[in-house]
Amino acid sequence: GGGAMEQHANCVDIEWDKVQPGDLLFYPEDEHVGIAAGRDWLGRLLVVHCAAGTNGVVISHRTGFETAARPVWYGEE
């Protein structure tokens, strides 16, 4: 529970050039969250997320995502 805002609260923001698979990507005001999946053959970031109107999970580019963040795991400071 808690949604994207709570997930973002448990992350540290990172620069876009530091994004690795598994990092979280957020829309403005944490309205939506996606997971970095890697990069396409042109080096563009790929994002896995649920998209309205698509009936499920999609892989897309980072359009609309404003902030990149890395989850802070238990035991890390």
Label for each model-derived stretch:
Residues F65-E77:
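Low-complexity, Gly/Ser/Thr/Pro-rich intrinsically disordered linker/tail segments
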